[in-house]
Amino acid sequence: MPTINQLIARPRVVQKSRKKVPALQQSPQKRGVCTRVYTTTPKKPNSALRKVAKVRLTNGFEVIGYIPGEGHNLQEHSVVMIRGGRVKDLPGVRYHILRGVLDTQGVKNRKQRRSKYGAKRPK
């Protein structure tokens, strides 16, 4: 516990809360260009090949974004839109790539939760 004199000499500093998605800079989404598209393996109890992309954003940040859904058409130099939202079993992946926006196609043959995957309504 500091004394009154110590507090007068050095007042308490308010700790700033750490942001979960700093690269978005308070925006809901950001546009970027894929610099690398690859697969990676998840943390311990899970096993898969998760599709991710390294994205250089318009504000200069370079982030890793998860590509949701089955199958994708992304490659290097694809222009994508990212949103916040981490992937729990992939360390360092704090963003999601939006499907059906810019160069990213929606998921084929998707019947339910279509809006999340940019799929059009089936006829």
Swiss-Prot record:
Keyword Zinc-finger among record annotations: no
PROSITE patterns on file: RIBOSOMAL_S12
One GO CC annotation: small ribosomal subunit
Stored Gene3D superfamilies: Nucleic acid-binding proteins
Disulfide bonds: none
Molecular-function GO terms, alphabetical: rRNA binding; structural constituent of ribosome; tRNA binding
Signal peptide: none
Domain of life: Bacteria
Pfam families the record matches: Ribosom_S12_S23 (PF00164)
Ribonucleoprotein in keyword set: yes
GO biological process: translation
Keywords in alphabetical order: Methylation, Ribonucleoprotein, Ribosomal protein, RNA-binding, rRNA-binding, tRNA-binding
Annotated positions of the 3-methylthioaspartic acid modification: 89
Family: Belongs to the universal ribosomal protein uS12 family.
Biological function: With S4 and S5 plays an important role in translational accuracy. Interacts with and stabilizes bases of the 16S rRNA that are involved in tRNA selection in the A site and with the mRNA backbone. Located at the interface of the 30S and 50S subunits, it traverses the body of the 30S subunit contacting proteins on the other side and probably holding the rRNA structure together. The combined cluster of proteins S8, S12 and S17 appears to hold together the shoulder and platform of the 30S subunit.
Subunit field text: Part of the 30S ribosomal subunit. Contacts proteins S8 and S17. May interact with IF1 in the 30S initiation complex.
HAMAP family found in the cross-reference section: Ribosomal_uS12_B
Protein's recorded name: Small ribosomal subunit protein uS12
Organism: Rhodopseudomonas palustris (strain HaA2)
Highest classification ranks of the organism: Bacteria, Pseudomonadati, Pseudomonadota, Alphaproteobacteria, Hyphomicrobiales
